[in-house]
Amino acid sequence: MVRRLWRRIAGWLAACVAILCAFPLHAATAGPGAWSSQQTWAADSVNGGNLTGYFYWPASQPTTPNGKRALVLVLHGCVQTASGDVIDNANGAGFNWKSVADQYGAVILAPNATGNVYSNHCWDYANASPSRTAGHVGVLLDLVNRFVTNSQYAIDPNQVYVAGLSSGGGMTMVLGCIAPDIFAGIGINAGPPPGTTTAQIGYVPSGFTATTAANKCNAWAGSNAGKFSTQIAGAVWGTSDYTVAQAYGPMDAAAMRLVYGGNFTQGSQVSISGGGTNTPYTDSNGKVRTHEISVSGMAHAWPAGTGGDNTNYVDATHINYPVFVMDYWVKNNLRAGSGTGQAGSAPTGLAVTATTSTSVSLSWNAVANASSYGVYRNGSKVGSATATAYTDSGLIAGTTYSYTVTAVDPTAGESQPSAAVSATTKSAFTCTATTASNYAHVQAGRAHDSGGIAYANGSNQSMGLDNLFYTSTLAQTAAGYYIVGNCP
């Protein structure tokens, strides 16, 4: 009796433990789900005044397994303000961060640049000697620390990110370089790299390369450079941007790869809704570390996407970068343990659906979030498809090929290949069948006589007596090769 009771208690305890393990022990405190009123934060003794701005604390719960919130610092560009351009305003949803914050349960910070740097309320990205304790870098790091250390926001210090436009894009890269221990991911929008001056925003100076920027970045990181091993980055720019040199976009990402060190593999280009094309890069461990997005036809602007502002260097007609970059950060975060580091599962169910003498048709099962699929023949990519089917043409007749398929995720790149399938193209010869007497077959060269018996040429199959009274059907399946019967 007692033994049975203890068994029941043990069962109840096991069930309770299983339930508790499936959910965070404490739900994150729900915020108001609205942008705050203007806040006043640390004083900037270098540029003057106090850092002011806004924050968004969502009512939704965080989506990460540890139940902690991500924190995103968003930096406006020159001649912009947080209230007029970044947060929701009379023109729309600003930079369009609110809906993304609700989706992921993330806290968003939108500060105003202190002082009047470069006479246009810019961020001081071109400071040749930035300090973690002074100027714009100092007050921004102080702001991040205020939220990370305030338990009511439940911020995960391993999920702190920064993104910005123009001078804010340049400052994004500065922060990523000088504080890689703070920022797990950065998103640079039309930002000049470290080591450039304000006079060089529109062109790449002679001799300036990604290595130049990487050397600056490493120097600023100092003793924190080891944290680059778990940081991820990306850059986005418009092909009609004539304010900041378009060449700085891929250069920014290349510089960060140099800082991260090791070998990188360029992935397949992936289309993003709104005219964007992303090129992901993976490290030697197969982890996605950088993205490079060019946006066709976009001028110098923050790519807010549908619903965002469409004025004063904010673009609502092209890609939604907040949606892209937040998904990119969450999927590929190397610190929080919540990201996969690469795209989703490889396609399953790859099968050969048809063959001809010059083509092979394939089909496979769809993969969630895949925007396209890569098709590989004998290990080399031969094409891509947005549907779950593909026909590979221009092949050699009577040849066997091996195929695999990958899934391409817009934010994380290409998956591992699927299981391989083999396909053999059909012979180029068109089979024909002839019915005649065995004697006629022998006389026509379709068969031969041996000891009064007719045999089909090639297969040497017996047809019976070689005379006018025995009739056979022979099918020519290849040049000089006949079988008894009709074409297969």
From Swiss-Prot:
Query: Where does the UniProt annotation place the signal sequence?
Result: 1-27
Keywords per UniProt: Hydrolase, Lipid degradation, Lipid metabolism, Secreted, Signal
Q: Which GO terms describe its molecular function?
A: poly(3-hydroxybutyrate) depolymerase activity
Q: What reaction does this enzyme carry out catalytically? A: [(3R)-hydroxybutanoate](n) + H2O = [(3R)-hydroxybutanoate](n-2) + (3R)-hydroxybutanoate dimer + H(+); [(3R)-hydroxybutanoate](n) + H2O = [(3R)-hydroxybutanoate](n-3) + (3R)-hydroxybutanoate trimer + H(+); [(3R)-hydroxybutanoate](n) + H2O = [(3R)-hydroxybutanoate](n-1) + (R)-3-hydroxybutanoate + H(+); [(3R)-hydroxybutanoate](n) + H2O = [(3R)-hydroxybutanoate](n-5) + (3R)-hydroxybutanoate pentamer + H(+)
Keyword Lipid metabolism on this protein? yes
Q: Which GO terms describe its cellular component?
A: extracellular region
Entry keyword annotation includes rRNA processing: no
NCBIfam families referenced in this protein's UniProt entry, alphabetically = esterase_phb
What is the protein name stated in its UniProt record? Poly(3-hydroxybutyrate) depolymerase
Q: What is the organism lineage in this UniProt record?
A: Bacteria, Pseudomonadati, Pseudomonadota, Betaproteobacteria, Burkholderiales
